[in-house]
Amino acid sequence: MRSDQIKKGLKQAPARAMLRAVGVGDEDFGRPFVGVVNTFTDGMPCNFHLRELAQHLKAGLKEAGLFPFEFGAPAISDGISMGTPGMRASLVSREVIADSVELIAQGYLYDGMVGLSACDKTIPGTAMGVIRSGVPGMILYGGTIAPGEWQGRKLTIVEVFEAVGQRAAGKISEEELLEIERRAIPGPGACGGQYTANTMAMALEALGLSPVGYNAIPAVHPEKERATKEAGKILAWAIAHDWKPKDFLTRKSFLNAIAAVAATGGSTNAVLHLLALAKEAGVELSLDDFDQISRKTPVIADLRPWGTYTAWELYEAGGTALVFKRLLEAGLLFGEEKTLTGRTLAEEVERAYREQEGQKVVFPVEKALKPHGGLVVLKGNLAPKGAVLKLAGTERTYFEGPARVFDSEEAAMEKVLKGEIRPGDVVVIRYVGPKGAPGMPEMLSVTSAIVGEGLGPEVALLTDGRFSGGTRGLMIGHIAPEAFVGGPIALLEEGDRIRIDVEGRRLEVLLPEEELERRRARWRPRPPAFTHGLFARYAALVRQADEGAVLEDPL
């Protein structure tokens, strides 16, 4: 065992003495040692319950003959930091989490790793770290929150964001906004639609890095405790057979994950995160793969933010296994791909498959809700390296209008709340990319305000930043190259005519190349937002969105 380097032999007596102090007994030195990264925090609901869940996980690992050691990693709430300078920390935390997992795995020479995650960046962050650690491992998702309720309709956090715009437009009262705020989040768990956390949780099941069916179990559902304990047996098998993530994560595994995201109208953040995970696994993946898979994968799940149902209701209907079953039946998944259990994806789906009688959440492919998946990649003179749109949130496929240019989200939000954005406008928010912000913050506050004011179908938004999984409307993000490095979005001026052609996959400013060249000659780079510390280092090393906003390796 790898951990024998720490716990066996004459010279390791001091190490054993220290391990005995934390509960390791004589018989435990013969067990595989496992690191459990727990992204618990009592600062947000997504990860609030992970302290208790970790106890069930560790009990299951011990029952399976392993010895677990728990450690922490940071967790940033997008819902709390949204629309504030704190949002810069969100994507940065993904890299910090991955580095933390790698650091502990290497420092303690553990034989296996488990990531216990819940909110948006803790899922890809722990997954990146577990893959990078080079030992058997898996990711367990804390689960979705239960929906809130107000006036007979189910609520998620997105309804609160949109209520801000409704209040600004005078469509609801201050008292109604307060009631929505009070009722939307009834307890622990991640945001309750097919937003980023639930999207990535499903994607990891399709990849084979999480047990099929586990991640769909809601945070406070009674089944979560039993399933968490059972997961220990899976890791014990993987360690016994030296079955590591890089042994089963293939290009086809990643195409399976993309298909799952496309079929459920999932978050555009999955593009960034799957690109980053593929890099860790040594798998070739590009933006074009997302577009190609999405073109042939219909939307078969009626899920929020664009649809009707919450993630809790998806679990009741049959969960991720039901989605995968439908896709396998249509030949849209590579069922022969192996998973962390050693069995194929198709075998795992058969073991986990169930369907609630009369459910209306997941449809057969022949009765799909939309003929094509939710992810669209646009290119053109505004996005030479690509931009990403979630089509499942809008029915418009062509838009042309004048640019309303803002160099920060705050400036755009001010105009939206004052009612100064008009139907037909194309709102441009730039200098908020991976290097420029830095950290590529999400724009949910401003997009939700636009939707809340009733402008969703009539206004488009472009940004070199990101969007929350809860975003809906004609919102195009991940524009690369970003403004900070001189990408064409930096050359836009107020009133420039923008054309968005979804069917043609084009994003363009209607200006002659000569004019763009004149503007490029006048353009000057901006000073960095940070000159020392973590954010300065991140900005110096981070790559563009089309490469997953991963950090540069030195070699």
From Swiss-Prot:
Sites bearing N6-carboxylysine, chain numbering: K121
InterPro entries, alphabetized: DHAD_IlvD/Edd (IPR050165), Dihydro-acid_dehy_C (IPR042096), DihydroxyA_deHydtase (IPR004404), DiOHA_6PGluconate_deHydtase_CS (IPR020558), ILV_EDD_C (IPR056740), ILV_EDD_N (IPR000581), IlvD/EDD_N (IPR037237)
Location of the active site: S468 (proton acceptor)
The keyword Amino-acid biosynthesis appears for this protein: yes
Binding site for [2Fe-2S] cluster: C46, C119, C191
Reported cofactor(s): [2Fe-2S] cluster; Mg(2+)
Pfam families reported for this sequence: ILV_EDD_C (PF24877), ILVD_EDD_N (PF00920)
UniProt entry tagged with the keyword Secreted: no
GO MF annotation list: 2 iron, 2 sulfur cluster binding; dihydroxy-acid dehydratase activity; magnesium ion binding
Keywords assigned: 2Fe-2S, Amino-acid biosynthesis, Branched-chain amino acid biosynthesis, Iron, Iron-sulfur, Lyase, Magnesium, Metal-binding
Co-factor binding details: Binds 1 [2Fe-2S] cluster per subunit. This cluster acts as a Lewis acid cofactor.
GO BP: isoleucine biosynthetic process; L-valine biosynthetic process
Reactions that this protein is recorded to catalyse: (2R)-2,3-dihydroxy-3-methylbutanoate = 3-methyl-2-oxobutanoate + H2O; (2R,3R)-2,3-dihydroxy-3-methylpentanoate = (S)-3-methyl-2-oxopentanoate + H2O
Top-tier EC class: lyase
NCBIfam families per record: ilvD, PRK00911.1
Protein family membership: Belongs to the IlvD/Edd family.
PANTHER family in the record: DIHYDROXY-ACID DEHYDRATASE DAD (PTHR21000), DIHYDROXY-ACID DEHYDRATASE, MITOCHONDRIAL (PTHR21000:SF5)
Function description: Functions in the biosynthesis of branched-chain amino acids. Catalyzes the dehydration of (2R,3R)-2,3-dihydroxy-3-methylpentanoate (2,3-dihydroxy-3-methylvalerate) into 2-oxo-3-methylpentanoate (2-oxo-3-methylvalerate) and of (2R)-2,3-dihydroxy-3-methylbutanoate (2,3-dihydroxyisovalerate) into 2-oxo-3-methylbutanoate (2-oxoisovalerate), the penultimate precursor to L-isoleucine and L-valine, respectively.
Protein name: Dihydroxy-acid dehydratase
Species, as recorded: Thermus thermophilus (strain ATCC 27634 / DSM 579 / HB8)
